[in-house]
């Protein structure tokens, strides 16, 4: 049983959760809003950031400048179909996304989405824990480790799990505060 691998897997789960949190808009323009957007470009789902320069000229605008002008319509269509809820405005060369101030209702909805993402992160950490503990039990059954050593490893995995879930909770609280702050 390798505890460091379990710790590494849990760290990856936390990073993935933090990445998901970054894609939730908070009323301020951010290029990370578009990180999850994949455009169907020449039959391949392609990340938007590889097809265009994405900038934030001011606090409420995201500017998308495609490298290939012919992809402008595809990008616009993809953004419209996405769950961003932001209508793109196309001027023929660039696409602008105006980030409106969040309404109280939209803030509540975003907190719900955030809560679900946090729960997904916690579930991922728990799955890693379950896998690690199963591995310890198997090693104990196969007499590779003693009962005391197995108990110690399980306790260590549980401590890692608690620490990881606590980190996800801190990330959630920080992002929730960011969303709910007017």
From Swiss-Prot:
Alphabetized GO MF terms: ribosomal large subunit binding
InterPro entries on file: Ribosome_recyc_fac (IPR002661), Ribosome_recyc_fac_dom (IPR023584), RRF_sf (IPR036191)
Main localization (coarse): cytoplasm
SUPFAM superfamilies, sorted: Ribosome recycling factor, RRF
Coiled coil: none
Compartment list: Cytoplasm
ATP-binding listed as a keyword: no
Superkingdom as given in the UniProt entry: Bacteria
A GO biological-process term: translation
Matches recorded under Pfam families: RRF
Function according to Swiss-Prot or TrEMBL: Responsible for the release of ribosomes from messenger RNA at the termination of protein biosynthesis. May increase the efficiency of translation by recycling ribosomes from one round of translation to another.
Family: Belongs to the RRF family.
Protein name: Ribosome-recycling factor
Organism of derivation: Gloeobacter violaceus (strain ATCC 29082 / PCC 7421)
């Amino acid at each position: 049983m390798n505890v460091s691998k379990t710790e590494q897997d849990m760290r990856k789960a936390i990073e993935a959760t933090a990445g998901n949190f970054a894609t939730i808009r908070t009323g301020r323009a951010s290029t990370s809003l578009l990180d999850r957007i994949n455009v169907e470009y020449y039959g391949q789902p392609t990340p938007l950031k590889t097809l265009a320069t994405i900038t934030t000229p001011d606090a409420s605008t995201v500017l998308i400048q495609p490298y290939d002008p012919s992809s402008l319509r595809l990008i616009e269509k993809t953004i419209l179909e996405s769950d961003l809820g932001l209508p793109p405005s196309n001027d023929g060369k660039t696409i602008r996304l105006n980030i409106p101030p969040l309404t109280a209702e939209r803030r509540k909805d975003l907190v719900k989405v955030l809560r679900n993402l946090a729960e997904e992160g916690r579930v991922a950490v728990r799955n890693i824990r379950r896998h690690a503990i199963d591995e310890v039990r198997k090693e104990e059954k196969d007499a590779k480790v003693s009962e005391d050593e197995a108990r110690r490893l399980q306790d260590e995995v549980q401590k890692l799990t608690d620490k990881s879930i606590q980190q996800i909770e801190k990330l959630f609280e920080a992002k929730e505060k960011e969303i709910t702050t007017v």
